[in-house]
């Protein structure tokens, strides 16, 4: 049979009519694109308000970066999201899903810790904990709180950048640290926010976002952790709650907005395909985009020129998280960038090999300069680091030969950001003005930072009030 015959107009029309006839139609109030932290939290809140939802998730499970690996002996570790800010929106959410919590610090490791520059192999002496160093840190904390955080009380609510944009939010964060004399705090910020990019050069808006009021309080106090130690518990509970409202392994084929979904209502249609199933056409009154807004992710959308222009401004880093099995290694090794500002691990590079109590298994997270080929690049970086450490005797000589990865996860694109020039030109005000336009709302880490509690804050304070109002809830 000739392909030209199948491709004729008559056959094309027949095939289109057949595809439409076999579609499964789903009518809901809100279609949610992305089943990570932002999308699942919003889904629960909307259901509680009486709305129907359909969560569209491309992976085989919900939860985004919240991954938990359990070894054959039953020892678990979180590979991605580890803790939650100890604020009301987080404790309320855990309570809503009946997931027990504890409060504490996750910064300890199992067994002794040694520090090396993973690039050169140089071993680093213990951190200075003298009284003078502590005084410098205390003074830096006070200055940061008084001169920076007090001026930007909205920082934990989202990128609610005012217009006009304060000039100091666009200068390099290292310059802001010098201006207000909180340089002694910068290594702590680097530790809490590894893989930010060069902390000395990123726009100050992003540096401040990484250590807002809530995080600062928790860093020197306590965080929320699931009582079981498994961050997956939150999403396992949510999955039970949402049931068949979650559509997994779903590829979005086409999204149309401002279209007639019935005789009286204008809304959105989302055509998805799942393996081994007929296509599904979701007809919704509103669309909530909770996945990273990259041109790749929203390629099936009917984007306006304005939306496409704004989304194209984003750049991102890459992040690869894994459990590495290194036989013979029984200590934690932390990466210390000798030649990096504030001694951040250089990118590309791992944060370290962090022991968590499972013999020979280590949590290893790698930062990359971009999101392309994350898994292959991440593994290569770990192997290069082990080769360097092996050469100086920090790990067994055969570590590289015996290295395996029983678990890994791609967390790219990571940390979507725009340039200082775009911030100055009002990028965030322009994008926030699109909330609700064309029956579409936007949420996620790109608006709140890679911090689940702050994402939920953004949902509760900015996204859900407008969305519920539009739905008449």
From Swiss-Prot:
Q: Recorded GO terms, molecular function?
A: oxidoreductase activity
Signal peptide positions (record): 1-21
Query: Per its UniProt record, what PANTHER family does this chain match?
Result: 4,4'-DIAPONEUROSPORENE OXYGENASE (PTHR43734:SF7), PHYTOENE DESATURASE (PTHR43734)
- Where would I find glycosylation on this chain? 98, 128, 181, 262, 330
InterPro entries listed in its UniProt record: FAD/NAD-bd_sf
GO BP annotations listed? terpenoid biosynthetic process
Per UniProt, its applied use is: Diterpenoid pyrones display various biological activities and higginsianin A shows anti-HIV activity.
- Which family is this protein grouped under? Belongs to the beta-cyclopiazonate dehydrogenase family.
Return the Gene3D superfamilies for the record: 1.10.405.20, 3.30.70.1990, FAD/NAD(P)-binding domain (3.50.50.60)
**Coiled coil segments of this chain:** none
Q: Which cofactor does it need?
A: FAD
**The organism's place on the tree of life at top rank:** Eukaryota
Q: In the UniProt record, does the keyword Membrane occur? A: no
* E.C. number: 1.21.-.-
For whether the record's keyword set contains Flavoprotein, the answer is yes
Provide the protein name: FAD-dependent oxidoreductase dpchF
Entries under Pfam families matching the protein: NAD_binding_8
Q: Which keywords belong to this entry? A: FAD, Flavoprotein, Glycoprotein, Oxidoreductase, Signal
Pathway field of the UniProt record reads:
Secondary metabolite biosynthesis; terpenoid biosynthesis
Q: State what this protein does.
A: FAD-dependent oxidoreductase; part of the gene cluster that mediates the biosynthesis of the diterpenoid pyrones higginsianins A and B. The first step of the pathway is the synthesis of the alpha-pyrone moiety by the polyketide synthase dpchA via condensation of one acetyl-CoA starter unit with 3 malonyl-CoA units and 2 methylations. The alpha-pyrone is then combined with geranylgeranyl pyrophosphate (GGPP) formed by the GGPP synthase dpchD through the action of the prenyltransferase dpchC to yield a linear alpha-pyrone diterpenoid.
